[in-house]
């Protein structure tokens, strides 16, 4: 079995066209290797604007992790540590973030295009394998859409703090509570590269997203530096906002044709949706309405946790994810 696994990894490397000499050295990968319990490696798939940077640890069935905004691959470090002993954990920098490519056109961030890019990424990293897909925030919305589009490629789906993309648009169209929660979206969409730089918006965004977690010791000072560095580039912030500009129409203009994939049915694979009780990003009806999108849905609420469900209470989050993965006691054997 080990020989088969090594052959699969070699094939994935060949398909991805990896070059160790060409790979950048990510400070977050260096840090992960200093403090983590497993070796972490990085690589790239594709070139130019289509390049995807990924970080890998562990062996076993493949789990692909996709972060949201504003973030980068390291938001999944606690999950990679928890399950790297029995799963092949691969976290990607989403398009526009971290060391991945950064297309200049808003249209390049449409969910349909991102899903096709994710499909190529999965095919390169885990050829012939049905994977577990995990997403948070925009990465979660993308993961939902991918599962609706290509359910045959996935073994199961786990989502942290995110609705299906089509459901999010439905909620914006008909739920006043969701419109109120998303009132920030038009202001965010109005920002451009010039205003982002003039307003020093990356610094404000970092403090809003991660300042409290650092002050309370949820993230270490070093981890705070890594997130600050990852978010400091105005171009990266502009690319993150492009996800909003490309995929969220004016609320009153949302129609049945706005979502993707079109006419998506209810998926049948096992799905886990984890929310935080203090997260104000989505209306309280999210979990109930998500049941119309997934026949085999498990929902969980992390008490006292806000939007950053992967790391605010990693022990609770990992227990839920581990049980969902079918691990005895919710953890890797021997851990």
Language-model features, listed with the residues they occupy:
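Bacterial N-terminal signal peptides that target proteins for export
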Residues: 1-11
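Conserved HGGG/HGGXW glycine-rich cap/lid loop of the alpha/beta-hydrolase fold
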Residues: 56-99
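Active-site helix-initiating loop/hinge in glycosyltransferases
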Residues: 68, 110, 312-313
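Flexible "cap/lid" subdomain of the alpha/beta-hydrolase fold that forms the substrate-access gate
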Residues: 25-40, 50-52, 62, 86, ...
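Mature N-terminal segment immediately following signal peptide/propeptide cleavage
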Residues: 43-49, 53-57
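Catalytic histidine-centered segment of alpha/beta-hydrolase-like enzymes
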Residues: 305-314, 318
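Active-site pre-Tyr helix/loop in NAD(P)-dependent dehydrogenases
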Residues: 69, 163, 308
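Bacterial N-terminal signal peptides
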Residues: 9-19
């Amino acid at each position: 079995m080990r020989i088969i696994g090594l052959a699969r990894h070699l094939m994935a490397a060949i398909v991805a066209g990896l070059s160790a000499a060409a790979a950048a050295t990510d400070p977050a990968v260096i840090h992960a290797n200093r403090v983590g319990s497993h070796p972490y490696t990085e690589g790239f798939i594709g070139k130019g604007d289509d390049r995807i940077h990924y970080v890998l640890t562990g062996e076993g069935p493949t789990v692909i992790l996709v972060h949201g905004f504003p973030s980068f691959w390291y938001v999944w470090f606690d999950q990679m540590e928890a399950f790297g002993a029995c799963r092949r954990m691969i976290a990607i920098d989403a398009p526009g973030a971290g060391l991945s490519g950064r297309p200049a056109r808003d249209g390049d961030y449409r969910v349909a295009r991102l899903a096709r890019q994710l499909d190529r990424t999965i095919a390169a990293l885990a050829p012939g394998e049905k994977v577990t897909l995990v997403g948070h925030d925009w990465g979660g919305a993308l993961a939902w859409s991918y599962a609706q589009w290509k359910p045959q490629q996935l073994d199961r789906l786990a989502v942290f703090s995110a609705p299906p993309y089509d459901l999010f648009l439905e909620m914006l169209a008909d739920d006043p509570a969701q419109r109120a929660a998303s009132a920030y979206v038009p202001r965010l969409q109005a920002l451009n590269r010039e205003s982002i730089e003039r307003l020093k918006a990356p610094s404000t965004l970092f403090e809003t997203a991660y300042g409290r977690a650092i002050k309370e010791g949820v993230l270490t000072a070093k981890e705070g530096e890594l997130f600050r560095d990852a978010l400091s580039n105005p171009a990266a912030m502009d690319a993150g906002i492009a996800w909003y500009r490309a995929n969220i129409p004016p609320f009153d203009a949302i129609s049945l044709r706005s979502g993707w994939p079109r006419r998506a049915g209810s998926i049948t694979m096992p799905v886990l949706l984890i929310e935080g009780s203090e997260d104000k990003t989505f209306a309280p009806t999210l979990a109930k309405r998500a049941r119309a999108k997934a026949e085999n849905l498990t929902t969980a609420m992390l008490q006292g946790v806000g939007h950053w469900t992967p790391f605010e209470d990693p022990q609770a989050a990992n227990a839920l994810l581990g049980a969902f993965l079918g691990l005895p006691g919710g953890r890797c054997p021997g851990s």
